UniProtKB/Swiss-Prot annotation:
Residues 102-112 are annotated as: Flexible loop. One of its GO terms (biological process) is S-adenosylmethionine biosynthetic process. HAMAP family: S_AdoMet_synth1 (MF_00086). K(+) binds at E46. It comes from Rhodococcus erythropolis (strain PR4 / NBRC 100887). It is found in: Cytoplasm. Mg(2+) binds at D20. This is S-adenosylmethionine synthase. Homotetramer; dimer of dimers. Catalyzes the formation of S-adenosylmethionine (AdoMet) from methionine and ATP. The overall synthetic reaction is composed of two sequential steps, AdoMet formation and the subsequent tripolyphosphate hydrolysis which occurs prior to release of AdoMet from the enzyme. L-methionine binds at E59, Q102, D258, K289.
Length: 404
């Protein structure tokens, strides 16, 4: 983002009842069930939902057993789809499962890395685990918010969470599970100065008045509630444009309104478009897949770097070759906000963080059933749950290594 001039930046979020998020939740709930019994399970589970049907496919190698149809139904019901009147019913929807085993050719590269097979390195357990795929992953942090996330996505997620809270608690009982939020922030250079526009689109019961009931309720119970909670004293919220269901009624929602797929909300899951994305989705993947574990690690690195005062904004990229333990590349971008030489920051990161896949799994304790809780409302900057990659436990060491 430019250091001077006024501009608008927009990010969106979706609720857990959005069709794509139903799929993410199912995939991650299956993953958690398998990791509970077998922490070394290899899991790649994809889900598709459409009218009256859930299809689960993928590759799993494990000693564990999971009752996948039950997990599917329980997840759908927990989200709130429990009646055909809402467009989907976890009690009666069809569930189709097509799960195979992980390719042995992929497994050999993860279990016995290139370093172990070709270079003869065998005494280091971390060096023996290779990356589960090639790819590039980004992490990002900024001083926009206390949780060091971009403000547009942080607010969009809070609005989506609040939509779900008022629905499930009965505050607004006429709401239904499907919904989306969007936040447009005016920036002056790198500083967020004004909340310009908020869009809230939510599924609802058929018999409600949009202008006289839904819009006032969402303004008071969702938007005002969130703004009061976050207490952004430096942000002008005096003249916010609120757009509620701009197309009109939104009764037909969920899988009946749109088919959903795992991994279709990767920008919602990360930084709302404020940072680059390597393209790999998270949900349904065990941590041997660097699409997931390395993206978490890079958020950990970026957040610690900003918390250490090395820069006000930082984006870090790591890249892997399938089967190799050591990353093939690391890149650091500070957008001119660095407090010391960027080369020194990059050197400090390599000294303090071990970015081999096995080390990431070890240091972030990722062989645990912690993933279903990340399936909606973002994987980063969460203030409602405790996630290991959000820790700033290495900020002091990083600051010292950078010479500050």
């Amino acid at each position: 983002m430019s250091k001077s001039g006024s501009r608008l930046f927009t990010s969106e979020s979706v609720t857990e009842g959005h069709p794509d998020k139903i799929c993410d939740a199912i995939s991650d709930s299956i993953l958690d069930a398998l990791l509970t019994q077998d922490p070394r399970a290899r899991v790649a589970v994809e889900t598709l939902v459409t009218t009256g049907q859930v299809h689960v496919a993928g590759e799993v190698t494990t000693t564990a057993y999971a009752d996948i149809p039950k997990i599917v139904r329980d997840t759908v019901l927990e989200i709130g789809y429990d009646s055909s009147a809402k467009g989907f019913d976890g009690n009666s929807c069809g569930v189709n499962v097509a799960i195979g085993a992980q390719s042995p050719e992929i497994a050999q590269g993860v279990d016995h890395s290139h370093e172990a097979r070709v270079d003869g390195i065998s005494d280091d357990e971390i060096d023996r685990q290779g990356a589960g795929d090639q790819g590039l992953m980004f992490g990002y942090a900024t001083t926009d918010t206390p949780e060091l996330m971009p403000l547009p996505i942080a607010l969009a997620h809070r609005l989506s969470r609040r939509l779900t809270e008022v629905r499930k608690s009965g505050v607004l009982p006429y709401l239904r599970p499907d919904g989306k939020t969007q936040v447009t922030i005016e920036y002056d250079g790198d500083k967020a100065v004004r909340l310009d526009t908020v869009v809230i689109s939510t599924q609802h019961a058929a018999d409600i008045d949009l202008d006289n009931l839904l819009t006032p309720d969402l303004r008071e119970k969702v938007l005002h509630s969130v703004l009061t909670d976050v207490n952004l004293t430096d942000l002008d919220t005096s003249d916010v444009r609120l757009l509620v269901n701009p197309t009109g009624k939104f009764v037909l929602g969920g899988p009946m309104g749109d088919a959903g797929l795992t991994g279709r909300k990767i920008i919602v899951d990360t930084y709302g478009g404020m940072a680059r994305h390597g393209g790999g989705a998270f949900s349904g993947k065990d941590p041997s897949k660097v699409d997931r574990s390395a993206a978490y690690a890079m958020r950990w690195v970026a957040k610690n770097a900003v918390a250490a005062g090395l820069a006000d904004r930082i984006e870090v990229q790591v890249a892997y070759a399938i089967g190799k333990a050591a990353p093939v590349g690391l890149f650091v971008e500070t957008f001119g906000t660095e407090k010391t030489d960027p080369a020194r920051i990059q050197k400090a990161i390599t000294e303090i963080f071990d970015l081999r896949p096995g080390a990431i799994i070890r240091d972030l304790d990722l062989l645990r059933p912690i993933y279903a809780q990340t399936a909606a409302y973002g994987h980063f900057g969460r203030t409602d749950i405790d996630l290991p990659w959000e820790s700033t436990d290495r900020a002091d060491k990083l600051r010292s290594a950078a010479g500050l």
